[in-house]
Amino acid sequence: MGRSYYVDDRVEKYFSKLVQQQKACITGLIIGQYSSQRDYAVLTAQTPQKEDQNEEKKPGLSKLEEIDDEWVSMHASQVGRMLPGGLMVLGVFLMTTPDLSKDAQTILRKLVFAVEKSSMKNRLWNFDEDDVSERVTLHICSSTKKITCRTYDINDPKSTPKPADWKYQNSVLSWLTVDCNVRVDVTIPLTSPSLTYQERQKSIRLGLVKWTKEIEDSVVLFNGQYKDKNGDLFEEQKKSSRSSSHYSPQIITANFLNASPLIDNTRSTALVQPCKSSLTIQGVMKCRGFIHSNRPKVKDAMQAIKRDLLNTIQDRCELLFEDMMLNGPSNENDACPLPQRVFVPINGSNLKLCDYLFGDETTSDLQSHFLEIMDQEVEQNELDFTEKKCELAHPEKRESEPASQHLESKPENKARSSSTSLLNKGLVISTIVASIAIIISFYYIM
């Protein structure tokens, strides 16, 4: 028996809107959440059109052969940065006219493996034994509205397609929010002060991998209580909530406790490592994870919030270095503010997506970016700025005041690029949560 996908009705409405475009073929991503019992699809986003898509077409290629899997994969990478913990790219969809339906499955197979590879390329965490390895492909005939849903095991390159059920839901899917502020203080040694940005980014990733192990081993308290990893998040489930067609948003607060080596009787050793410079990431990260409210498990909530922390650290560092490679730093001895995280609600749901902003960007820039990448219109008053801009200070003031409360900003002006530069969405802004800023600093040893 194949997997079953419970699909929010907004997805069906979105497909109806795409049909009206009357295009020969449209590709896009399916976003949602896997679980051991059910899979949930909550959102879909079509692939942005390349500006040069109508130029320099190779002769003899069909519409399906013109689909650029690399472009679709780049879109998946950008979408991945906008997903909080618990949500992920479940797979891909392809809408075609009847005459192109015959070869649709071949294209979908190619796309689903390419998208998965791109989505996981730079992630700090790895899948565990509880993760679902199947990804979904969906073909929609724009004329007959017929849907063909299949899954592939992304751990097996020779995987054969399996049939799956695609079930639209009339009621609103209910979600539980796991909310957390995590103080981060990570120092990463660099072997040489003359490293290129690419080499420095690689060194930082290696340093973050070691820190990732600490996060994965940490204990998470939910609403101040320790709960068994394999148990239910709530001891009692309200029977009335199952039959209700309306969701009531629930928020659980999480707290991280670092594991002590004395607890598990492991020996702690000091590591001596020569270095010419170091990089420090300090501040408080605002993290959120979402899990479906149908008998939520402790391990699911723990996984969602931990992966959100790891993802947002990695994404912000990548965005900062992308910006440095494009524009160059004003002074590498200064603290560089990491991007500001902004949460964006999904209409009709208590789910939220996220995005990152430069210091000189406005909410209009964020709205344009969301429309381009997620194909979603966002109202300005709906934006959730849980991380606020901090006041900048001069270098001499930082000597007498806590470094984590003041940052040095970069003077370059930046604007969002067009869809042809999806991978160059550098986003840099000073951020603060509870008066504590997120900074990244370089220190050089003479």
Swiss-Prot record:
GO cellular component, one term: membrane
Keywords of the record: Membrane, Transmembrane, Transmembrane helix
Transmembrane segments: 76-96, 426-446
Primary location: membrane
Keyword Membrane assigned: yes
Top-level taxon of origin: Eukaryota
UniProt xrefs under InterPro entries: ODR-4-like (IPR029454)
Record bears the keyword Transmembrane: yes
Cellular localisation: Membrane
One GO term of the biological process aspect: protein localization
Membrane topology: Multi-pass membrane protein
Signal peptide extent: none
Compositional bias ranges of the Basic and acidic residues kind: 394-415
Stretches for region Disordered: 394-417
Family membership noted in the UniProt record: Belongs to the ODR-4 family.
Function of the protein: May play a role in the trafficking of a subset of G-protein coupled receptors.
Protein name listed in UniProt: Protein odr-4 homolog
Organism for this UniProt entry: Xenopus laevis
